[in-house]
């Protein structure tokens, strides 16, 4: 029989068509004047001159202009193509205006392309044209099919075939249902359609219009090769055979927003909009007989009909013939018939053509186990299973999130692979015979278009409805919620399936970045792999590629007709013969055998205490624990940071693979043969097995040597430590197995990859990499493992080099654009790279690589490093390691015999250690071994049960034997198979007795795999699991009873008990224990390397660090006494406080997250080789130094989330965690959320202490075990007792403001912050923080009720002291009279009354209170009464260098009035308020009221002011000759800061309307206006009521017996006349000693800060101008005000009113709002109106409204109206004085 012609030519226009139906349809539409007999088409070309219209149409093809479509914007190269395209947009009514063609009789052909399956070829999975377009991309048109001319027996002469079709055509009533069997009868096998019929007729027009082939250019070969893909996309490099395909593809790059004109849905490119517009096609010919819905495709109708109940009992079609819909043969029926013919090997079709009930299941054998959906092909089922891979799948291009893998795959096609399907031109492929039969078919009545809102599939849980069942199945996965975190990165997923899918992303990360230019000519290896038998024998790939091979097998006509395909009942793969199927089934039997063997393996006995995940081996559990080791881990090579240890390990592997890829590129570029490194087994992927259609790498790399092969698709070919352990895993096995098998597959693949990185080369050199692959001959291995650069075409290499012209000098990566290179350079920050073989350091990786060349292959370090598992230090030799253990940890129990045996074991282990490689991979492997401890030679060996560490295997074995012998009777040993040896598992219940000598790990215990076969991984773990279940925190402190999970945590905790007076010699700070001192060294690098002046106390029963030799005898006595007390304390009392943490070790939690240093301090600097050149701080690792250097990169670094500024990168990085890390730990009592669990635990202690404080005011003896031997006071912690210890230096630290003494300088500095912060707030005009409760006596605010009660107790003590001090025998007046003068009355109902009486100056030159003695004792007692406040500092007392003195102690000239004001002790520190100071009480009681100034008083020679301390005279800030005078206004100031603040250059914007004073800011003006308001209210109050003979005496008190309110008053006078500034002494500067602690000083105002960030924040206050708010039209005077104002818009309003629901940002505003709803009651009643007020400030403001109605007498005394008798008990207003405090608003 003759060969099949390549195509069918039209005799009129010389156009070519792939089959007869296309030709017949073309002649019917274009050449209606020609003969209609299809059998006379002889294929003889006719000239264009025979038909003038054809010649005119043909000439349009040569027009080279661009013709855009006005509807969709698509461009065409000629007018004919545009006209053909415009028919797709024309409505159906417009298409029928012409002569009655076949379109009228078959209207459904206008917009729906008939499937070519009716011609005997079923493509893809039988899903219509969409799946056919998918097959175009996957099989590359003709590549996957065989030569059409090869099947000589399947083709007949075309005219003969046409005649047969016409002769067998039935009448019009039969429709097309009976016509197809005539074509596909037994006598004539079905016509196999070439792959080119996938392109529609319109695309054929486009292809010929863009490129005009001449006769010499037309392809003559039947099979186009890869070289004919000459149409390349300029943006992404994708190539196509036809220009129309390229034009279609370019629409995917037209990015933008393209809304649908019907449903207004937006799309990112034109291709997506075009595909979507097909859903809105008006012509839906397929109607459902049960509901009014209609569909475009028959398969959609068939799927819809399955949703109706009772579908099987009904017969939707009237006739029993093959079901037809509007003249179309149902696609599913044709697919089933063709499938049947393919499986049975016969072309017979059912004569009845009925759609049986079970026909769907009969011809759809592949069923989904999850949803029950069935398919005809195994590949369709594999593709469908991806829809069940639920999770969150973000698109890497547009960041859209999809919820299953199938949706993501379809979504990515919209970006990169636009569908080149038919139906684009709206033309149907049908023969002339079909059209003729369709003309005789009666026209089907049109049914109204169905409603688009019909959603039959409804979710039972949430009620959401869907149109398709698959959408409902995908939606149901969203209800399976949970929290599954990836072990390699910090990402979390809502279900386990999403987590498994995410793990694959780590394995195939490079698949997304595959270079599109790597396509070339297929290699001989690939041609060899096209055989399914060879592929299955060599390697069983994932099911996606198996689907491709199956489609290739089914698309081969000769193979389908020659033999019956054999289907595997397990995986659904197809094979051409029974022999291939039997060969394939062997793999399943081996898998079943391996699963059977795995079921015999021991149970999962090792469970994680944190997440509950269980493992069979202890090593797997130890590796798994790394996922819970959260923190800030930095890579030493690129300074990248990670949240978990597992993520950093995964990152280190990436460096190793990148280096290998660059090394192989270099080798291939020089023409050398790249061989595998002998140092380890590699995880490689054969590209040929993965993608048969892809080509070799253009740089000459073999498939096993490229980066893509390392990670693509996660198909790991593992070359293990032994050849028989190389296991080939299939990707989809994780989804087909049960849950346990799935977890095992992921764990084994992950663990296999990690373990093989450290596998010695001599264990795998028997077979090498390729030797471990089964089913591969030597030639095949040689072709895979070696490559030759000359085998690649030169043009591909040229294209590669031309595309990548920009090369990175550091890593060698190439980029096509300069922008890509610039963005890539940020990945190579300057850092320190240390050689793993010598201590040399380099600035970049290229320098380190060149240095590696200097080391020889056999060069090894002098000795294997020894890692201390207690502190993490590494020692080069055993001697230094043992010396460190004896000195630092006290571990000296090793015997000489054990040492010798240990050395011999170490030497034996070192001989089997892998040789060092001359590559960067060895550096990374060394880093991995330090972190993971994969190689056990020379490292500590950790018992998996008890955590005890041994530095040799012999000691570990003896440990197991000793425990086994002592506990053999209690435990039954179980045998495990580990490396071929059975090992006994023993228990360890004698663990508590050896806790002290346990070598605790620092939380990083690792597995010791591959070291030897004598000790298995699961030693001591089965019985240890039961112990861990009963003791989840096995490491217990023997002093306080606190328990920990890890030994390293216990080691760090024990430093708290190493108490002592640790004084830093650099900054003179004192710390009570070693932990606090070490934390201080971290924060202050300048102090690092210095030893504390006083040695620490050795912990009882534990290890201690080296003592300082020089210790005082008295200090040793105190330390010994404390140690004895610690030993005497019973364990029960210590266990009661095990959860308490010493209150002095306040370590910043963010710094603990940043760096967890557990290393011991030692003088050996060589073990910390990385030193900072700025501050001298040293580190063990280069990554730590790189991380530290960020703290020196000072500048202005702003947070993008909250606009907060920072002074260095480290602060900004730590701050970003606040925004990034979720606050998942929430307090159940108050609802506050925290990022860390320990933060929540510390917060919950506050609630617990508050609950305890409500029940008992003081803790019991059991809760406070540490007692002072001198005074009997008890404490919770030893550090608090050490601070309390009374020593001779206890009184040398005194506060210059309030004369309070402290035992150490740290406590004094903490106390001085109370004074400095209040003064700084008053200087800057910033309002004070709102307090929760306030004292009614002095107005001080407190954060809690407990602080207020302590403060009121101080008032009570002060009252008693004053009463006892005035009861002396030398008092000038009686005690009762003095008590009345002072106004100190008894406390009633928690309220005290304090009245102040003023005396005029006495003739002696001293103004003396009638009750206060003029001696130092009286001064000291007055200090206990007085209050340090800047607002009251300008009355009664003077502040000289922080020393407050009374006016009776100051020598002033005659004629000046001075006043005296006493103050209450509101300034006392809460930390020191547990007990009063008895020293000054005694001096108060023993004071002589008649005595004058004592000799110890120090008077100023210029002004006569007296001081209690001599340093008060040395303060130059108040010296007369050092006064600072303004040159413009001659005003004097005490210090340069106040002078600098006072300036005349500020714009006159904020001026007071009363006194014309100019203020610098609006807040300062508002503060100033309050002074005027208070002055007026004082005057009105003074004129309202007076009591007693003195007009200056006033009392304000609440109504009712025994209640009153005090208000300080004084005589009017100018404060500057007394030498005190108007701001109340705010300009007083601190001594220079404190300047060292506040090194950051503002250049404009001189204000100093401890941190650079505080200075940066303060400098915003000086940026004066008009700063508009971006959210509201408000203008702010400076940046600081703008920042504070922006919080009103951004901060959430957490505090809501329970009555009206209004929300506020702060609790203080909510409290103020609550007064609106509260009844108008209070102690202050207005005498002119019935209003009452709770607070004095509100009452004074209200009185200001009445002041204009009051007459003022000529003498200045106000005449107040008479008050009613009921108001006589109300409080009187204070004496009018211009010195009323400006911040009276705080005295509520």
From Swiss-Prot:
Residues 1374-1383 have a biased composition (Acidic residues). Transmembrane segments: none annotated. GO terms for molecular function: zinc ion binding. It comes from Mus musculus (Mouse). Residues 28-38, 306-333, 1351-1360 have a biased composition (Basic and acidic residues). Belongs to the krueppel C2H2-type zinc-finger protein family. Residues 427-440, 962-972, 1406-1425 have a biased composition (Polar residues). PROSITE patterns: ZINC_FINGER_C2H2_1, ZINC_FINGER_C2H2_2. This is Zinc finger protein 646. It comes from the Eukaryota. The gene is Zfp646.
